[in-house]
């Protein structure tokens, strides 16, 4: 499997390389500096070439379209290791951890507080598909993407509120994420103000 990292990560790289080794496979690390795609080669050409050498690709990148284009033009499985839109592998790991703790997922209430970012989006989709109750608390200006809210609309198991304390009522699992993701460093001060109170602390968990 080829591991393409447009965005660096300690845990994503180590977990995929370790997992492939433990399963008897091999992982080939590829940064943007190692690929012609980083120097203007069309993604369709990269997808076709890598499909001749690899059995699969995991890509951690910025734009969701890059993942979709690799899948469109390549002939091997493409794994989304992270994009600005979603973070499915992380949420699969989170759901596995929750199931290890409780033995089930169905019927549990999972709460997320903070930015309506890629983590929030994947938790909404993953949680609802697993028949969990999903409660999200985020400021109005940082809500999850409209297409995801449309996906969740009409599902009684989903709630979206502004108040973190209300969101965590009777929750079995409480999750949060960084207020400032990679590439948003210039917004750090604004985000610190916007997300005051959107953190897991003693007051919230009391």
Predicted regions and their residues:
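Phosphate/diphosphate ligand-binding glycine-rich loop within oxidoreductases
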Residues: 1-99
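Glycine-rich phosphate/diphosphate-binding loop of Rossmann-like nucleotide-binding domains
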Residues: 6-19, 100-177
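Short beta-strands and strand-loop turn motifs
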Residues: 28-32, 79-81, 107, 136-138, ...
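A short, aliphatic-rich alpha-helical micro-motif
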Residues: 51, 71, 167-169, 205
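Glycine/Thr-rich phosphate-binding loops of Rossmann-like dinucleotide-binding domains
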Residues: 67, 120, 183-184
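Short gly/ser/thr-rich secondary-structure transition/capping motifs
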Residues: 95, 154-161, 194-198
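Glycine/threonine-rich flexible loop motifs
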Residues: 178-198
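Rossmann-fold NAD(P)-binding glycine/threonine-rich loop
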Residues: 196-206
